[in-house]
A protein has these predicted regions:
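N-terminal beta-alpha supersecondary unit
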Residues: 1-65, 71, 75, 108
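Short beta-strand scaffold segments in enzyme catalytic cores
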Residues: 2-8, 124, 132-136
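A contiguous, well-structured pocket-lining segment that forms one wall/lid of small-molecule binding clefts
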Residues: 20, 62, 176-246
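Short beta-strand segments
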Residues: 20-22, 70-72, 103, 123-128, ...
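Nucleotide and nucleotide-moiety/phosphate-recognizing core
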Residues: 59-65, 87-104
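Short Gly/Thr/Asp-enriched flexible loops that form oxyanion-binding sites at enzyme active sites
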Residues: 71-95
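Conserved phosphate-binding catalytic cores of ATP/NTP-utilizing and phosphoryl-transfer enzymes
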Residues: 101-123
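Glycine-rich phosphate-binding loop plus the immediately following alpha-helix
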Residues: 128, 139-183, 207-208, 212-217
Length: 246
């Protein structure tokens, strides 16, 4: 997605989202079964100017009222991130405003407290794309990693499972959608390293088990739904159990 938002900091330190505009690229990438970096970057270039202007319009603020500009600096696809960074820096320079490069994962870690007060420290399960982590968020810029994946990221496992079951792109939402039509207890799937101490995760074995079962389906639609539901249910059980091992 290409996105822009205007955030207001209130006197008490809380925040208010004045506008949040998102342009999705899902239809563009759906035909390829995943994100094509070059196409994504081109779409960002085509959409970002309009998105920023609309965010300002919805917020009812002119650029002169904005105190600072922030843009995601990583982690992520640099060919895409560069688009936002360049335009963010350009706007900041033109408007004589400070520019802040934001860590993508730190944004996820702190966003739960954007409009609702959450007191530090708190335990965070961060599962975003190629990242699967349990973090102890002690304060802004103070994070302790309690566990991470030792092989595949959960996002990859969802995408690969959706592909194995021919459920289409994007994998996560489609698995969630079709899981509602299946029996989550139909397949007994492995929960890798679930009894190992600590909060580390592993999804390679689960992904292999799904591949093995998917080859036995032979086009049976209900079995595909059952396997999707069983996969999602197994993931939920793994995450809940590991949460208690911190």
């Amino acid at each position: 997605e290409t996105a822009a938002a205007v955030i207001q900091e209130n006197e008490d330190g809380s925040a208010k989202i004045l506008s949040s505009i998102v342009s999705s690229q899902i239809e563009e990438h759906e035909k390829f079964g995943g994100v094509v970096p070059e196409l994504a970057a081109r779409a960002h270039v085509e959409n970002i100017d309009f998105i920023i202007k609309k965010a300002l319009k919805v917020s009812k603020l002119g650029i002169e009222k904005i105190d600072g500009i922030a843009a995601t600096a990583g982690p992520g696809l640099m060919v895409c991130l560069t688009v936002g960074l360049n335009i963010g820096k350009s706007i900041a320079a033109f408007a004589d405003k400070p520019f802040v490069a934001v860590n993508h994962l730190e944004g996820h870690a702190l966003s739960p407290g954007l409009e609702k007060e959450i007191k530090f420290p708190y335990l965070l399960l961060l599962i975003s794309g190629g990242h699967s982590q349990y973090l102890l968020v002690n304060d802004i810029n103070k994070y302790e990693q309690l566990g991470t994946t030792i092989d595949d990221a959960l996002g990859e496992a969802f995408d690969k499972t959706a592909k194995m079951l021919d459920l289409g792109y994007p994998g996560g939402p489609n698995i969630e959608k079709f899981s509602k039509l299946g029996d989550k207890n139909f397949y007994k799937l492995p929960e890798p390293i679930i009894n190992r101490a600590g909060c580390n995760l592993s999804f390679a074995g689960l992904k292999t088990a799904v591949l093995r079962e998917s080859k036995k389906i032979n086009g049976d639609l209900q079995l595909r739904y059952n396997l999707a539901a069983s996969f999602q249910n197994t993931v939920n059980k793994i995450l809940k159990k590991k949460r208690k091992r911190q």
